[in-house]
A protein has these predicted regions:
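Acidic, Ser/Thr/Pro-rich intrinsically disordered cytosolic tails and loops
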Residues: 2-192
Length: 192
């Protein structure tokens, strides 16, 4: 028997019972050797606890999509959504049935007007989150709109088997160390 559809917010806020039911939703088969949360943590390079929190935020986001108008996810929540879509039987079956409607994920059309629209929509999502759930979203999973969209054009998928990632700060420190180390060696051998 299918679970009941989650109710709409009452006086702008989700009911305690519906919030509990929302967070009780499980994704994927529970008897698998690798749970949804474990797969998410592995694929994203996250700690398992962070992945579990990201899934809870994704569930809240999905609820907002149904009850608070067009919403835009944080990068982390979007990664949960992408993985959930690969669990298609679960996604298009029990999950959307519980939400009470289908929830589609579409790409941007691109361009400056779309960037502006999605940034404003994301800010509205943060405001709706605070209103519906009675508290602001956690900043480590839902950064402010300006911060969330500042890094977006610079993000890339990277195959860590082929590439090593080093921060620019670390590279600058290594470069400075090599430069000053070279000066010290040159000075000690009388080259300067």
């Amino acid at each position: 028997m299918a679970a009941d559809v989650l109710g709409a917010p009452v006086d702008g806020a989700i009911s305690i019972d519906d919030h509990r039911a929302l967070l009780a939703i499980t994704i994927g088969p529970q008897q698998a050797d690798l749970s949804f949360e474990q797969r998410l943590a592995h694929e994203q390079g996250w700690e398992l606890g962070f992945a579990k929190r990201a899934v809870q935020e994704y569930l809240r986001f999905a609820y907002l999509c149904v009850h608070a108008g067009p919403c835009t996810p944080s990068v982390e929540v979007d990664q949960v959504w992408h993985l959930h879509l690969t669990y298609s039987r679960d996604y298009w079956g029990p999950f959307t049935q519980r939400l009470g409607q289908d929830l589609h994920h579409g790409p941007t059309k691109g361009g400056e007007s779309e960037d502006t629209r999605y940034e404003a929509q994301y800010a509205s999502t943060l405001a709706a989150y605070a209103r519906v759930f009675g508290r602001p979203p956690p900043a480590d999973l839902w950064p402010p709109a300006k911060e969330r969209f500042a890094s977006f054009p610079h993000q890339r998928w990277v195959d860590l088997r082929k590439h090593t990632l080093t921060s620019r700060r670390t590279l600058a420190l290594i470069g400075a160390g090599l430069f000053f180390g070279g000066l010290a060696l040159g000075w000690s051998f009388g080259s300067f």
